[in-house]
């Protein structure tokens, strides 16, 4: 997948799910299921409920995403 096809949205983590998955509510009121990106796992960045995050999604499946950044 080319990098240009990625959509980025800010959101808030609402729920922690099993297997390092998170339920994220985007600013446009959609709820998706997201997992943390490999660099966040490698650097052991913790994501908790209530954290503001940046989520990458593909235009092909708008129900799943990847958390790439935890906002301050």
From Swiss-Prot:
Xref: Pfam families: eIF-1a
Subcellular location, principal: cytoplasm
Domain S1-like: 1-72
Gene3D superfamilies noted in UniProt: Nucleic acid-binding proteins
Gene Ontology molecular function: any one: rRNA binding
Keyword entries, A-Z: Cytoplasm, Initiation factor, Protein biosynthesis, RNA-binding, rRNA-binding
Domain of life assignment: Bacteria
Subcellular localization, as worded in the UniProt entry: Cytoplasm
GO CC, alphabetical: cytosol
Subunit field text: Component of the 30S ribosomal translation pre-initiation complex which assembles on the 30S ribosome in the order IF-2 and IF-3, IF-1 and N-formylmethionyl-tRNA(fMet); mRNA recruitment can occur at any time during PIC assembly.
Similarity annotation: Belongs to the IF-1 family.
Function comment: One of the essential components for the initiation of protein synthesis. Stabilizes the binding of IF-2 and IF-3 on the 30S subunit to which N-formylmethionyl-tRNA(fMet) subsequently binds. Helps modulate mRNA selection, yielding the 30S pre-initiation complex (PIC). Upon addition of the 50S ribosomal subunit IF-1, IF-2 and IF-3 are released leaving the mature 70S translation initiation complex.
Family matches, as PANTHER family: TRANSLATION INITIATION FACTOR IF-1, CHLOROPLASTIC
Protein name as annotated: Translation initiation factor IF-1
Organism encoding this protein: Brucella canis (strain ATCC 23365 / NCTC 10854 / RM-666)
Lineage: Bacteria, Pseudomonadati, Pseudomonadota, Alphaproteobacteria, Hyphomicrobiales
């Amino acid at each position: 997948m080319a990098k240009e096809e990625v959509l980025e949205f800010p959101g808030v983590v609402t729920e922690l799910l099993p297997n390092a998955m998170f339920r994220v509510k985007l600013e446009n009121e959609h709820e998706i299921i997201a997992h943390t990106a490999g660099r966040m796992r490698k650097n052991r960045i913790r994501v908790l409920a209530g954290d503001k995050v940046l989520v990458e999604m593909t235009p092909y499946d708008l129900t799943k995403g990847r958390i790439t950044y935890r906002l301050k």
